[in-house]
């Protein structure tokens, strides 16, 4: 039996797999918007990284996910935080330490987002890291899923079809997408030098 998704949940980068980017909420309207106030703020765990590993980052383009009232959000360095969406209380932080493998060579460090997956019982968050890892994280514990890949990790550096290239030229331009038993991970490669006056 298919479970009903709570109104207000935002389980994928675009809201749903249709990427409709719509939530049927009506508490905030054009008339009361000017009265809104900041309820809580969250300090990114990236700020606690050692200085030599805190690489320059690009624009923050990830979208927080909401699943049953819990917010899951990633940082540009690839850490995932679970937060109480009402209070902002930090429930757990998962750090894949992918930044230890170095930054991209021709672009700022950026992690575009995370993906929620469930089979109706098991619930996971997927992230494709800058270190070319696909990681499955248990949303209850914040720990890698030991039943996925190699203790929660899949090495995405395998079977590229090319023998020689600089691994740090490859980045992920979008969050992974998980459908059924398949996880789709896109990537892009900078195979030429990037300059301000380079053509688009």
Where are the regions a protein language model picked out?
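A structural motif specific to WD40 beta-propellers
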Residues: 39, 89-93, 143-146, 155
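Extracytoplasmic beta-rich repeat domains
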Residues: 42-63, 93-119, 150-175
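Beta-propeller blade signature
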Residues: 137-142, 198-200
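Repeat-blade elements of multi-bladed beta-propeller folds
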Residues: 10-14, 56-79, 106-133, 168-192
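Acidic, proline/glycine-rich low-complexity intrinsically disordered segments
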Residues: 10, 17-18, 44-46, 66-69, ...
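Blade/loop signatures of beta-propeller domains
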Residues: 1-43
């Amino acid at each position: 039996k298919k479970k009903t998704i709570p109104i207000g949940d935002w389980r994928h980068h675009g809201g749903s797999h249709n990427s409709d980017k719509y939530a049927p909420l009506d508490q905030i309207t054009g008339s009361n918007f000017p009265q809104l106030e900041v309820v809580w703020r969250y300090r990114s765990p990236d700020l606690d990284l050692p200085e030599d590993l805190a690489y320059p980052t690009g624009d923050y383009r990830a979208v927080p996910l909401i699943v049953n009232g819990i917010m899951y959000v990633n940082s540009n360095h690839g850490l995932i935080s679970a937060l109480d969406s009402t209070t902002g209380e930090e429930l757990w932080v998962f750090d894949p330490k992918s930044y230890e493998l170095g930054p991209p060579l021709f672009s700022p460090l950026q992690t575009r987002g995370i993906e929620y997956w469930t089979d109706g019982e098991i619930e996971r968050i997927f992230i494709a890291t800058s270190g070319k890892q696909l990681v499955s994280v248990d949303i209850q514990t914040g720990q890698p899923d030991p039943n996925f890949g190699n203790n929660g990790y899949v090495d995405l550096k395998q079977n590229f079809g090319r023998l020689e290239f600089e691994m740090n030229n490859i980045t992920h331009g979008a969050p992974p997408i998980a459908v059924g038993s398949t996880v789709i991970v896109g990537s892009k490669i900078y195979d030429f030098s990037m300059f301000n006056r380079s053509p688009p």
